[in-house]
C-alpha cells in the first residue's frame, strides 16, 4: 500500500455497542503492526505504523540465517541454507538444511521446531538465506507452501534460488498469497560462496 501510518482517535465517551456510534473496520489486521497509544485532549489516539523500516532488524536475522547455513554438510543434491523464525510475541526458532533429516529444508526444520513448541506462527517473519522453494520431490509440501499454510506475514532472504535443480517461483507464490517478501541482495554473495560446492561463487 500507499499508506505508511494510520492514526485513529476514539472518544472514550462512546459506548461499545452503541447502535448510533460510527463504525470503523480497519482494512488490515491491527495485531500485525507496531502501534502507539496516547491521550490527546480527551481522545484515545492509536497510531499504527503499517510499513516500519525494518532494514536493521532484517539484516540482523538474515546474517544469523546465513551463519546457520554453514552448519549444513555440503551435498551434491542440496543447497546449504539457514532459517530463523521470529514470532509476533518475539519467540525465535532456527533451522538449517538436513539438520534432523536428509530430506528437510531449513525453513521446514525451523517450522517443525516452532510447531512442536506450540508457537503461534500467524503473522510471524521467517528469514532464510535463500528463497524458499516452490517445488519438492522429497516432501509433500514446498517451503513456500508451508509458509503460506502457517500464516506467516513476512519472508526475508538474500539470494533468489539459482536454477541448479528447478526453476523456483517461491517469492512469486508468497507474494500472490499475501506474504510480504523482502530481498537483500547485498548479502547474496556470501550465500553463493557457502554453496560453492554446487558451482556457485561470490
Predicted regions and their residues:
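Enzymes that bind and transform nitrogen-containing heteroaromatic metabolites
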Residues: 1-63, 70, 114, 118
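Residue-level signal for inorganic ion chemistry
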Residues: 4, 65, 82, 133, ...
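Zn2+-dependent cytidine deaminase-like catalytic core
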Residues: 8, 13-16, 87-193
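A polyampholytic, Gly/Pro-enriched intrinsically disordered region
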Residues: 28-41, 175-186, 200-202
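Short beta-strand scaffold segments in enzyme catalytic cores
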Residues: 46, 80-89
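Secretory/periplasmic and organellar redox-cofactor proteins
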Residues: 50-57, 66, 171, 175-181, ...
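Short helix-to-loop capping/linker segments positioned immediately adjacent to catalytic or ligand/cofactor-binding
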Residues: 69-75
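Short, basic and Ser/Thr-rich N-terminal targeting/leader segments
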Residues: 77-81, 104
Amino acid at each position: 500500500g500507499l499508506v505508511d501510518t494510520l492514526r485513529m482517535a476514539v472518544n472514550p465517551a462512546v459506548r461499545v455497542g452503541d447502535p448510533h456510534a460510527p463504525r470503523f473496520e480497519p482494512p488490515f489486521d491491527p495485531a500485525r503492526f507496531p502501534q502507539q497509544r496516547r491521550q490527546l485532549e480527551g481522545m484515545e489516539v492509536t497510531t499504527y505504523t503499517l510499513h516500519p523500516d525494518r532494514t536493521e532488524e532484517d539484516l540482523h536475522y538474515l546474517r544469523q540465517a546465513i551463519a546457520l547455513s554453514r552448519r549444513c554438510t555440503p551435498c551434491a543434491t542440496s543447497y546449504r541454507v539457514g532459517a530463523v523464525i521470529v514470532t509476533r510475541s518475539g519467540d525465535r526458532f532456527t533451522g538449517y538444511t538436513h539438520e534432523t533429516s536428509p530430506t528437510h529444508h531449513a525453513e521446514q526444520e525451523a517450522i517443525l521446531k516452532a510447531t512442536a513448541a506450540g508457537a503461534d506462527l500467524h503473522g510471524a517473519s521467517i528469514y532464510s538465506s535463500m528463497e524458499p522453494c516452490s517445488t519438492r520431490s522429497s516432501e509433500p509440501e514446498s517451503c513456500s507452501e508451508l509458509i503460506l499454510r502457517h500464516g506467516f506475514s513476512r519472508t526475508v532472504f538474500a539470494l533468489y534460488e539459482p536454477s541448479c535443480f528447478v526453476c523456483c517461483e517461491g517469492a512469486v507464490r508468497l507474494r500472490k498469497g499475501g506474504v510480504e517478501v523482502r530481498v537483500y541482495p547485498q548479502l547474496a554473495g556470501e550465500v553463493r560462496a557457502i554453496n560453492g560446492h554446487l558451482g556457485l561463487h561470490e
